[in-house]
A protein has these predicted regions:
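Gly/Pro/Ser/Thr-rich low-complexity, intrinsically disordered segments predominantly at protein N-termini
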Residues: 1-199
Length: 199
Protein backbone atom coordinates (compact mmCIF):
# COMPACT_ATOMS: atom_id res chain seq x y z
CA UNK A 1 0.00 0.00 0.00
CA UNK A 2 1.51 3.36 -1.05
CA UNK A 3 0.85 6.76 0.58
CA UNK A 4 1.07 10.05 -1.31
CA UNK A 5 0.67 13.17 0.88
CA UNK A 6 -0.82 16.14 -0.99
CA UNK A 7 -0.79 19.83 -0.04
CA UNK A 8 -4.47 20.66 -0.42
CA UNK A 9 -7.81 19.57 1.06
CA UNK A 10 -6.85 16.02 0.09
CA UNK A 11 -4.79 15.00 3.10
CA UNK A 12 -3.54 11.85 1.43
CA UNK A 13 -4.31 9.25 -1.17
CA UNK A 14 -3.89 5.57 -0.29
CA UNK A 15 -3.62 2.86 -2.92
CA UNK A 16 -5.89 0.29 -1.26
CA UNK A 17 -6.81 -1.50 -4.49
CA UNK A 18 -5.22 -4.80 -3.32
CA UNK A 19 -7.55 -4.78 -0.27
CA UNK A 20 -10.78 -4.58 -2.31
CA UNK A 21 -12.96 -3.25 0.53
CA UNK A 22 -16.57 -4.37 0.40
CA UNK A 23 -19.33 -1.77 0.80
CA UNK A 24 -19.83 -2.92 4.40
CA UNK A 25 -16.11 -2.62 5.20
CA UNK A 26 -15.89 0.82 3.58
CA UNK A 27 -18.99 1.98 5.48
CA UNK A 28 -17.51 0.74 8.76
CA UNK A 29 -14.20 2.44 7.96
CA UNK A 30 -16.01 5.76 7.30
CA UNK A 31 -18.10 5.37 10.47
CA UNK A 32 -15.00 4.86 12.62
CA UNK A 33 -13.24 7.91 11.16
CA UNK A 34 -15.97 10.54 11.07
CA UNK A 35 -13.61 13.51 11.31
CA UNK A 36 -12.69 12.95 7.66
CA UNK A 37 -14.46 12.60 4.34
CA UNK A 38 -13.60 9.60 2.19
CA UNK A 39 -14.10 8.64 -1.42
CA UNK A 40 -12.68 5.83 -3.55
CA UNK A 41 -11.66 6.70 -7.10
CA UNK A 42 -11.87 4.52 -10.20
CA UNK A 43 -8.40 3.05 -9.60
CA UNK A 44 -9.38 1.84 -6.12
CA UNK A 45 -7.39 4.52 -4.26
CA UNK A 46 -8.84 5.87 -1.01
CA UNK A 47 -9.00 9.68 -1.00
CA UNK A 48 -8.99 11.30 2.44
CA UNK A 49 -10.10 14.94 2.66
CA UNK A 50 -10.33 17.33 5.57
CA UNK A 51 -13.56 19.13 6.54
CA UNK A 52 -14.12 22.50 4.85
CA UNK A 53 -14.26 25.87 6.57
CA UNK A 54 -17.37 27.80 7.58
CA UNK A 55 -17.46 29.86 4.38
CA UNK A 56 -17.43 26.71 2.24
CA UNK A 57 -20.15 25.20 4.42
CA UNK A 58 -22.31 28.34 4.02
CA UNK A 59 -21.90 28.31 0.25
CA UNK A 60 -22.64 24.60 0.04
CA UNK A 61 -25.75 25.03 2.16
CA UNK A 62 -27.00 27.78 -0.17
CA UNK A 63 -26.42 25.63 -3.26
CA UNK A 64 -28.24 22.66 -1.74
CA UNK A 65 -31.11 24.88 -0.56
CA UNK A 66 -31.69 26.29 -4.05
CA UNK A 67 -31.46 22.89 -5.72
CA UNK A 68 -33.80 21.23 -3.23
CA UNK A 69 -36.35 24.06 -3.43
CA UNK A 70 -36.47 23.76 -7.21
CA UNK A 71 -36.60 19.95 -7.09
CA UNK A 72 -39.55 19.99 -4.68
CA UNK A 73 -41.50 22.39 -6.91
CA UNK A 74 -40.77 20.51 -10.12
CA UNK A 75 -41.32 17.03 -8.70
CA UNK A 76 -39.47 15.28 -11.55
CA UNK A 77 -36.27 14.58 -9.66
CA UNK A 78 -34.69 14.36 -6.22
CA UNK A 79 -31.91 16.51 -4.75
CA UNK A 80 -29.15 15.05 -2.58
CA UNK A 81 -26.26 16.53 -0.60
CA UNK A 82 -22.73 15.34 0.10
CA UNK A 83 -23.61 12.79 2.77
CA UNK A 84 -25.11 10.66 0.03
CA UNK A 85 -22.64 8.44 -1.80
CA UNK A 86 -23.08 6.35 -4.93
CA UNK A 87 -21.00 3.87 -6.92
CA UNK A 88 -20.13 4.73 -10.52
CA UNK A 89 -19.76 2.07 -13.25
CA UNK A 90 -15.94 2.32 -12.97
CA UNK A 91 -16.18 1.34 -9.28
CA UNK A 92 -15.56 4.83 -7.87
CA UNK A 93 -17.57 5.71 -4.76
CA UNK A 94 -18.28 9.42 -4.91
CA UNK A 95 -20.15 12.04 -2.90
CA UNK A 96 -20.34 15.39 -4.72
CA UNK A 97 -21.39 18.52 -2.86
CA UNK A 98 -24.84 18.31 -4.47
CA UNK A 99 -26.48 16.01 -7.00
CA UNK A 100 -29.83 15.34 -8.61
CA UNK A 101 -31.45 12.18 -10.00
CA UNK A 102 -34.63 11.84 -12.07
CA UNK A 103 -37.36 10.29 -9.92
CA UNK A 104 -38.21 7.55 -12.40
CA UNK A 105 -34.57 6.43 -12.45
CA UNK A 106 -34.26 6.59 -8.67
CA UNK A 107 -37.47 4.65 -8.05
CA UNK A 108 -36.52 2.09 -10.71
CA UNK A 109 -34.10 0.86 -8.05
CA UNK A 110 -35.60 -1.57 -5.57
CA UNK A 111 -36.14 -0.38 -2.00
CA UNK A 112 -33.19 -2.53 -0.96
CA UNK A 113 -30.98 -0.94 -3.62
CA UNK A 114 -32.03 2.58 -2.56
CA UNK A 115 -31.18 1.76 1.04
CA UNK A 116 -27.74 0.44 0.12
CA UNK A 117 -25.02 2.65 1.48
CA UNK A 118 -23.40 3.16 -1.93
CA UNK A 119 -26.20 2.61 -4.45
CA UNK A 120 -25.14 1.77 -7.97
CA UNK A 121 -26.69 4.70 -9.80
CA UNK A 122 -25.27 7.56 -11.84
CA UNK A 123 -26.74 10.98 -11.03
CA UNK A 124 -28.13 13.05 -13.90
CA UNK A 125 -26.49 16.19 -12.50
CA UNK A 126 -23.66 16.94 -10.06
CA UNK A 127 -22.15 20.02 -8.43
CA UNK A 128 -18.68 20.28 -6.96
CA UNK A 129 -17.86 23.43 -4.98
CA UNK A 130 -14.18 24.31 -4.77
CA UNK A 131 -12.96 25.07 -1.26
CA UNK A 132 -9.92 27.27 -0.64
CA UNK A 133 -7.59 24.30 -0.24
CA UNK A 134 -8.94 22.22 -3.15
CA UNK A 135 -6.60 21.47 -6.04
CA UNK A 136 -8.43 22.68 -9.15
CA UNK A 137 -6.84 20.10 -11.48
CA UNK A 138 -7.98 17.23 -9.23
CA UNK A 139 -11.54 18.60 -9.22
CA UNK A 140 -11.47 18.93 -13.02
CA UNK A 141 -10.37 15.30 -13.30
CA UNK A 142 -13.18 14.29 -10.95
CA UNK A 143 -15.70 16.15 -13.10
CA UNK A 144 -14.35 14.34 -16.16
CA UNK A 145 -14.82 11.03 -14.36
CA UNK A 146 -18.47 11.88 -13.67
CA UNK A 147 -19.13 12.61 -17.35
CA UNK A 148 -17.25 9.51 -18.55
CA UNK A 149 -19.47 7.42 -16.28
CA UNK A 150 -22.79 8.83 -17.51
CA UNK A 151 -23.52 12.08 -15.64
CA UNK A 152 -25.33 14.34 -18.12
CA UNK A 153 -24.46 17.76 -16.66
CA UNK A 154 -21.96 18.91 -14.07
CA UNK A 155 -20.94 22.24 -12.57
CA UNK A 156 -17.60 22.91 -10.93
CA UNK A 157 -18.11 26.16 -9.02
CA UNK A 158 -14.95 28.08 -8.11
CA UNK A 159 -15.85 31.00 -5.80
CA UNK A 160 -12.22 32.15 -5.55
CA UNK A 161 -11.83 32.75 -9.29
CA UNK A 162 -15.57 33.46 -9.73
CA UNK A 163 -15.77 30.87 -12.46
CA UNK A 164 -18.14 28.04 -13.27
CA UNK A 165 -16.87 25.12 -15.35
CA UNK A 166 -19.81 23.44 -17.10
CA UNK A 167 -19.34 19.78 -18.09
CA UNK A 168 -21.75 18.24 -20.57
CA UNK A 169 -22.46 14.69 -21.73
CA UNK A 170 -20.79 15.36 -25.11
CA UNK A 171 -17.58 15.94 -23.07
CA UNK A 172 -17.49 19.65 -23.93
CA UNK A 173 -16.44 22.03 -21.15
CA UNK A 174 -17.53 25.67 -21.00
CA UNK A 175 -16.07 28.16 -18.52
CA UNK A 176 -18.21 31.12 -17.43
CA UNK A 177 -16.50 34.16 -15.90
CA UNK A 178 -18.30 35.75 -12.94
CA UNK A 179 -21.83 34.65 -13.88
CA UNK A 180 -24.65 35.84 -11.65
CA UNK A 181 -26.86 32.87 -12.57
CA UNK A 182 -26.38 29.55 -14.31
CA UNK A 183 -29.03 27.49 -16.06
CA UNK A 184 -29.77 23.81 -15.66
CA UNK A 185 -30.32 23.71 -19.42
CA UNK A 186 -32.54 20.90 -20.72
CA UNK A 187 -31.37 18.49 -17.99
CA UNK A 188 -32.87 20.56 -15.16
CA UNK A 189 -35.35 22.57 -17.19
CA UNK A 190 -36.32 25.76 -15.38
CA UNK A 191 -33.59 25.59 -12.74
CA UNK A 192 -31.32 28.59 -12.32
CA UNK A 193 -28.72 28.76 -9.57
CA UNK A 194 -28.36 32.30 -8.20
CA UNK A 195 -24.65 32.77 -7.55
CA UNK A 196 -24.85 36.17 -5.83
CA UNK A 197 -24.80 34.42 -2.44
CA UNK A 198 -21.89 32.21 -3.51
CA UNK A 199 -19.55 34.97 -4.68
Amino acid sequence: MSVAPIQDSVLLTLDISPLKMTDQQFYEFCRRNQDFRFEIDGTGSLIVTSPGGLETSKRNSEINFQLRLWAEKGKIGLAFECRGMFTLPNGARRSPDAFWILKDRYYALSKEEREERFARIVPDFVIELRSKSDNLRKLQNKMGEYIENGVRLGWLIDPYERRVHIYRADESVEVLENPQKISGEDILSGFELDLTEIW
